[in-house]
Amino acid sequence: MDLLLILKAVIMGIVEGITEFLPISSTGYLILSADLMSFWTKEKADLFIVVIQLGAILAVIYEYWGRLWHALMGLITGKSEGPNALKNPRQLGLSLIVATIPVMLVGFTLADQIKEYLFNPYTVAIMLILGGLLIFYVERKQIPVIAEEAEDVSLKTALLIGLMQCLALIPGTSRSGSTIIGALWLGVSRKAAAEFSFFLGIPVIIGAGLLDLLKHKDVLSSGQDWLILGVGVLVSFVVGLLCIRWLVDWVSRRDFTIFAWLRIITGIIVLLVAWIFGYTIQG
């Protein structure tokens, strides 16, 4: 058993758990981490990067199970009763469905092309910088709040957030970043924007992870390969759960400017390294 490879999987799980819900691009940081550690072959690393996100999104389901159940029941029956009851459960359920449709269509059509041509440090660096500039722009605008809670998000706003999420298919953009910042831009409160982004990631990440695993499961040729993947998923679940709780508290007190600086600085460093040393994704 390769203990060093297991340690690298643990590190990748920590990176995923920390970055999945922050507006800094978990996929981008996973690609860079895999390159820096020479983690697995390119085919196995690419599969790992997509599937490991299942752990973090399972943390969302665990943390918000009560509200998600009420949203599902509200979508079916129109009612929400008991603990964690929502004032408008059907609206939340419909908004999440509407916001999910665009990225499902685009992702299903272009997933393989995106992985083949855009999973590299250059793309990550450029999108990190552009995303950081967008965060600066939105944070400096005085935008009136029109949706205090996640269930207040209208279908029109949900569709626009869903279109913003399509940008996150490009590594370095950040799914949480595009949806949270997009929601803030459209007048959703900070806490509601974060929670709507958490919920929106459930069908997208589960769908992408399971689809990629089914299509490329033959890449995992041994029991150890599956163990490595399982370790990464488990670690990302635990770390992701801690990060969710921290982020909800953070957004109620501060803005995302620090993450804009982090994105831009990281992007510039990666571009400089790529230019000076010819740094490219392993292949």
From Swiss-Prot:
Highest taxon above the source species: Bacteria
Any one cellular-component term (Gene Ontology): plasma membrane
Statement: the UniProt record of this protein carries the keyword Cell wall biogenesis/degradation: yes
GO biological process, one term: regulation of cell shape
Main location: membrane
EC number: 3.6.1.27
Annotated localization: Cell inner membrane
Swiss-Prot/TrEMBL keywords: Antibiotic resistance, Cell inner membrane, Cell membrane, Cell shape, Cell wall biogenesis/degradation, Hydrolase, Membrane, Peptidoglycan synthesis, Transmembrane, Transmembrane helix
Residue ranges of the TM segments: 4-24, 45-65, 91-111, 118-138, 153-173, 194-214, 228-248, 258-278
One annotated GO molecular function: undecaprenyl-diphosphatase activity
Membrane topology term: Multi-pass membrane protein
Catalytic reactions on record: di-trans,octa-cis-undecaprenyl diphosphate + H2O = di-trans,octa-cis-undecaprenyl phosphate + phosphate + H(+)
Family, per entry: Belongs to the UppP family.
Note: Bacitracin is thought to be involved in the inhibition of peptidoglycan synthesis by sequestering undecaprenyl diphosphate, thereby reducing the pool of lipid carrier available.
Cited function: Catalyzes the dephosphorylation of undecaprenyl diphosphate (UPP). Confers resistance to bacitracin.
Protein's UniProt name: Undecaprenyl-diphosphatase
